[in-house]
C-alpha cells in the first residue's frame, strides 16, 4: 500500500504543513541554542585573540598546546575556512583537522601538522578583524572585544547549524520510536538485519547491497520487521531526512534513488521509506516517487500505519 507517493493531490498541502512544522520547531529551539553556545565559546575565543598582541603572530605551538583551538582559528581567516578547504590548503588529511578539533589528534600528528595549518591561518588572517597586527602597538580593549564578538558570531553559526542538524535527527528518530513502541514493537540490537524478529526494530543498522560486483553497506536509520513478516526477511528501511530550506534538497535526491536501485538489484522487492521533515518541494517528491520511493511526513507520523505495522 502506498503511503504518500501516489497521493499527488495532497503534496502541495503537505509541503506547506511540513515547512510550518519545521519552522515552529526552529523558532523554539534555535535562539536558545545559539545563546548557550555563545556563552560557552567566548572564553576560548578571547584566549586565541590574546596570541595576536602587537607584532606577535600566532605561532605553531598554539595548536600543540591547545589543539581544539583550531575550530576558532578557522573563523579568524578571510574567508573563514571550512575543514576540507583547510585540509586541502595545508596538504593534510581531512581527518587530521577533525582530530585537532575534537582533541583526538596524536602528539605526533600535532607536531607534524601544526606548522602547515598555522602557515595557512597566518597567510589568510583577517586583518580587518585584527588591525593592530604589525602596527607597532598592542590592541585596545575595544579592538579585542570587537574581534572577539565577530569571531564568536561566526563560530556560533557553524556550531549552531551542526547542533540543529543533530537535534532534528534525534527528534525525528524519537518520533518514529515512540510510534513503534505505541504499537508494541520492541527495540533490538542485532548485528545484521537477518537477526531481527517480527515485531522488532533496530536503530542505525547497515544493509549490505551490491554496487556492480562490489558489496557496500547502506546505512538504515530505522529498520522495522512487521509482525506479519517472516523471520530473516528484509525489513522496512526508514531514512530520516530533514531540510531547513529548499536550496539543497534537490542536489541530494539522487542519493536516495541510487540506494533504492541498489536495494532492488540486490533483494528484488524492497521497501525504502523516507521520514521527511522540513523543506521538500514538488520537484523532489516527484523525482523520488518516480523511483518507487515512498515517504512519511514528520508532521503526520500516524501515516506509518499504512506500512502494515
Each model region followed by its residue ranges:
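Acidic-basic catalytic patches of nuclease active cores, encompassing PD-(D/E)XK
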Residues: 155-209
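Catalytic core segments in nucleotide and nucleic-acid processing enzymes
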Residues: 190-309
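Nuclease-adjacent, charged terminal/linker segments that flank catalytic cores
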Residues: 1-149, 154-163, 170
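Generic hydrophobic secondary-structure signal
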Residues: 2-4, 20, 28, 37-43, ...
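Generic detector of bulky aromatic hydrophobic side chains
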Residues: 31, 35-38, 46-51, 116-122, ...
Amino acid at each position: 500500500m502506498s503511503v504518500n507517493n501516489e497521493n499527488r493531490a495532497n503534496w502541495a498541502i503537505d509541503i506547506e504543513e511540513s515547512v510550518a512544522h519545521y519552522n515552529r520547531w526552529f523558532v523554539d529551539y534555535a535562539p536558545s541554542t545559539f545563546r548557550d553556545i555563545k556563552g560557552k565559546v567566548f572564553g576560548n575565543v578571547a584566549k586565541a585573540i590574546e596570541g595576536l598582541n602587537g607584532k606577535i603572530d600566532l605561532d605553531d605551538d598554539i595548536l600543540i598546546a591547545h589543539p581544539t583551538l583550531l575550530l576558532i582559528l578557522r573563523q579568524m581567516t578571510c574567508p573563514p575556512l571550512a575543514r576540507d578547504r583547510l585540509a586541502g590548503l595545508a596538504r593534510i588529511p581531512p581527518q587530521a583537522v577533525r582530530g585537532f578539533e575534537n582533541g583526538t589528534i596524536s602528539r605526533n600528528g600535532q607536531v607534524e601538522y601544526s606548522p602547515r595549518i598555522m602557515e595557512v591561518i597566518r597567510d589568510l588572517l583577517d586583518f580587518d578583524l585584527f588591525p593592530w597586527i604589525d602596527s607597532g602597538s598592542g590592541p585596545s580593549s575595544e579592538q579585542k572585544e570587537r574581534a572577539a564578538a565577530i569571531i564568536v558570531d561566526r563560530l556560533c553559526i557553524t556550531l549552531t547549524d551542526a547542533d540543529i542538524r543533530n537535534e532534528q535527527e534525534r527528534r525525528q528518530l524519537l518520533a518514529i520510536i515512540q510510534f513503534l513502541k505505541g504499537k508494541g514493537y520492541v527495540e533490538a540490537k542485532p548485528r545484521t538485519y537477518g537477526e531481527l524478529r517480527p515485531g522488532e526494530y533496530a536503530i542505525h543498522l547497515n544493509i549490505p547491497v551490491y554496487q556492480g560486483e562490489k558489496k557496500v553497506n547502506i546505512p538504515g536509520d530505522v529498520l522495522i520487521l512487521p509482525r506479519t513478516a517472516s523471520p530473516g526477511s528484509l525489513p522496512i528501511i526508514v531514512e530520516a531526512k530533514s531540510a531547513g530550506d529548499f536550496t539543497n534538497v534537490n542536489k541530494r535526491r539522487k542519493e536516495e534513488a541510487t540506494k533504492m536501485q541498489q536495494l532492488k538489484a540486490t533483494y528484488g522487492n524492497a521497501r525504502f521509506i523516507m521520514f521527511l521533515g522540513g523543506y521538500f518541494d514538488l520537484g523532489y517528491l516527484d523525482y523520488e516517487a518516480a523511483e518507487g520511493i515512498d515517504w512519511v511526513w514528520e508532521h503526520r507520523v500516524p501515516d506509518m500505519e499504512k506500512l502494515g505495522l
